[in-house]
Amino acid sequence: MDKRGGMDHVLVWRQGRFSRQINLTTVGRVSLALLLVLAVMVASLGVGKLMLSPWEVLRALWSSQPEGAALIVQQLRLPRVVLAALVGGALAVSGLILQAMIRNPLASPDILGITSGASAAAVFYLSFLAATLGAHYLPLAAMIGAATAALAVYWLAWQAGVSPQRLVLTGVGVSALLMAATTFMLVFSPLTTTLSAYVWLTGSVYGASWRETRELGGWLLLIAPWLVLLARQVRVQQLDDGLAQGIGVRVQWLRVALLLLSVALAGAAIAWGGAMAFVGLIAPHIAKRLVAPGFAGQAAMAFLSGAGLVMVADLCGRTLFLPLDLPAGIFVSALGAPFFLYLLIKQRH
């Protein structure tokens, strides 16, 4: 092992012919972000109609008797907070992959039609199938919609390969078409269905249970090995296609693999948390500003940033307008829309 100086402290680990660099500055900042996210989680568990101090929250978490404060924390608040963190983290990493793959800082699941596809499928399910099959299959319908939309965008953008620019333009067009279809279905749906759909379309973790949290957590654990496997390839996508092909990279196959990985992350997050816009745009930019280039460190920071963002948004929705419980997506959009305009202005200059 040896250390290298510079702006960032880097630890180089060597074993035989293999070596690996560990950016100590990145590790430190990710660790600090993790502590901040845990602090937000404790605060979220303590705030509500029944106010609890941090020490009372910790006692409730460790209590083996699910009654009183322990029942509220363990069965009502904790599943919701954990689901919010998983949804935000998955959307953030999905956005990070897309921004690297398309080489566009404005890329996100919203731009490529992933969110619109999930939304259209979810509204279709609520309007025509939920009465027969029940609401349990809504996440599956949303994931199928997200995957179908993404594959349609890729197929329509194909022209002897897919360029990042064509992918974005096609994604915007498909998103607009799917949003129109979603609105059309909402107009002709019963009022109760429309109200349920609007809450889902805004993005909310209201009424989250341990079943939903386990389902999303299990799905993300299945995706994690593929994320690790493709981590080193993400930076290759940031190169010019000709240069990447020159060093032996199968650019189009890699682009398909990364797109499917991004869809798997975003589709699952949207399926269980609703169409929460802008998380996949904001969190990757926070990560890029805080840690050095390198997908592993940026992915960890993006996950924590997205988790914290959605948890804070959900906390605001639960507490700022009591007794109303507003969808977290409202507060994420309130922050994300100005940030998107800022990026547009920055890109122009």
From Swiss-Prot:
GO cellular component, one term: plasma membrane
Subcellular location: Cell inner membrane
Pfam families, per the entry: FecCD
Alphabetical keyword list: Cell inner membrane, Cell membrane, Ion transport, Iron, Iron transport, Membrane, Transmembrane, Transmembrane helix, Transport
Topology in the lipid bilayer: Multi-pass membrane protein
Domain of life where this protein originates: Bacteria
Statement: the UniProt record of this protein carries the keyword Lipid biosynthesis: no
SUPFAM superfamilies per UniProt: ABC transporter involved in vitamin B12 uptake, BtuC
InterPro entries from the UniProt entry: ABC_BtuC-like, ABC_transptr_permease_BtuC
Family: Belongs to the binding-protein-dependent transport system permease family. FecCD subfamily.
Annotated function: Part of the binding-protein-dependent transport system CbrABCD for uptake of the siderophore achromobactin. Probably responsible for the translocation of the substrate across the membrane.
Stated name of the protein: Achromobactin transport system permease protein CbrC
